[in-house]
């Protein structure tokens, strides 16, 4: 995109994460301050919608398409130099009115947190709908945990990323009370140039048809399905804790939860690793080998214990996301 490489202005990452006792956030009655883009503006900003990234869900077959654009930092007008943005194409339900869709977008725009990808604006014109987000230069976390071409993330960076993700989810639970975050997956955990975490959050299934029902959101990714959903069809905030526990396990081991059955007993990742998670003498056997010995064993063991709590079958025995956030902050302080 030429010289358009300047990120949105951000505060430098603090030396140590702040507790989430009072959410560093904003929700109503804060104004959404979203720009309503014209189709011609996005067409120019993205150089005629030059496709740059397609995310395909292996679980329910959706395709999510993003375009890279460049806009002026102050006016948000198309520009050769300025800030880079991500433009996501949406697919609306035909039964939904344009006004209803805009209200959903504005509602999302009123939710603000440093660990959520920022919504900048929207466009609904020419029978097409788009959402415009800030651009995250490091991309998705799964690229660094599972990607062969990237260097292994150091232990401290992994913990920092996990803390940011936990903080964003705890905040969403605080805002929505009992809302479910259906898009909690590794590829929705995005990173800026300083490896600060930004969770990609759409807020409502009404914004995009790819945000389908709870059932279709889980089809095919059984490794992330909390047991209470299988038993009763119930999902809640503690279901998010379970899913996040599986993601933490992937961060710890460098293995995909869906690849867990490659072990000799054909067990899923969270099943066969359980005996190793809280045993300091065994934890080395499941740690991402790319870390070598460059990590604090006590901290890794505490991470394993936290994961075991997150993936307990009984929802009442799982921690809240606030407690997960606190636990990860404690782990970050362990240096041996």
Swiss-Prot record:
Q: How is it modified after translation?
A: N-terminal myristoylation is critical for plasma membrane localization and implication in defense responses.
Q: Does the keyword Cell division apply?
A: no
Which molecular function GO terms apply here? ATP binding; protein serine/threonine kinase activity
Q: What happens when the gene is disrupted?
A: No visible phenotype. Slight hydration defects of wild-type pollen placed on the stigma. Slight hydration defects of wild-type pollen placed on the stigma of plants lacking both BKN1 and BKN2, but normal pollen grain adhesion and pollen tube growth. Partial suppression of the pleiotropic phenotypes conferred by the dominant mutation zed1-D (e.g. high-temperature-dependent growth retardation and autoimmunity).
- Domain Protein kinase: residue ranges: 52-332
Name of encoding gene: BKN2
Compartment(s) where it occurs, according to its Swiss-Prot or TrEMBL record: Cell membrane
Protein name, entry field: Inactive serine/threonine-protein kinase BKN2
Q: What does this protein do?
A: Together with SZE1 and ZED1, required for effector-triggered immunity (e.g. Pseudomonas syringae type III effector HopZ1a) via the activation of ZAR1, thus being essential for resistance against P. syringae pv. tomato DC3000 expressing HopZ1a. Collaboratively with BKN1, involved in compatible pollen-stigma interactions.
Q: GO terms for CC?
A: nucleus; plasma membrane
Q: Which source organism?
A: Arabidopsis thaliana (Mouse-ear cress)
């Amino acid at each position: 995109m030429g010289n358009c490489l300047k990120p949105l202005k951000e505060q430098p990452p603090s030396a140590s994460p702040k507790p989430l006792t009072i959410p560093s956030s904003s929700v109503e009655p804060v104004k959404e301050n979203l720009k309503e883009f014209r189709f011609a503006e996005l067409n120019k900003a993205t150089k005629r919608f030059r496709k740059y990234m397609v995310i395909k869900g292996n679980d329910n077959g959706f395709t999510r398409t993003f375009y890279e654009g460049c806009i002026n930092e102050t006016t948000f007008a198309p520009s050769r130099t300025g800030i880079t943005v991500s433009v996501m194409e949406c697919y609306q339900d035909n039964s939904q009115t344009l006004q209803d869709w805009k209200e959903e977008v504005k509602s999302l725009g009123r939710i603000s947190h440093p660990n959520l990808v920022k919504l900048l604006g929207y466009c609904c014109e020419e029978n097409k709908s788009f959402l415009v987000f800030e651009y995250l230069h490091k991309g998705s976390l799964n690229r660094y945990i599972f990607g062969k071409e990237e260097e292994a993330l150091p232990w401290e960076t992994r913990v920092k990323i996990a803390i940011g993700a936990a903080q964003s989810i705890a905040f969403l639970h605080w805002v929505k009370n009992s809302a479910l975050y259906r898009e909690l997956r590794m590829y929705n955990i995005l990173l800026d140039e300083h490896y600060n975490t930004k969770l990609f959050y759409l807020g409502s299934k009404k914004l995009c048809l790819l945000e389908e029902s709870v059932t279709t959101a889980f089809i095919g990714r059984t490794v992330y399905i909390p047991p209470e959903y299988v038993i009763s069809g119930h999902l809640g905030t503690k279901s998010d804790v379970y899913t996040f526990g599986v993601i933490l396990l992937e961060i710890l081991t460098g293995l995909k939860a869906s690849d867990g059955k490659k072990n000799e007993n054909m067990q899923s990742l969270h099943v066969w690793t359980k005996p190793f998670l809280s045993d300091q003498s065994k934890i080395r056997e499941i740690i991402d080998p790319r870390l070598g010995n460059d990590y604090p064993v006590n901290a890794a063991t505490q991470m394993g214990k936290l994961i075991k709590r997150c993936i307990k079958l009984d929802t009442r025995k799982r921690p809240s996301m606030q407690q997960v956030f606190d636990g990860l902050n404690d782990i970050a302080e362990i240096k041996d």
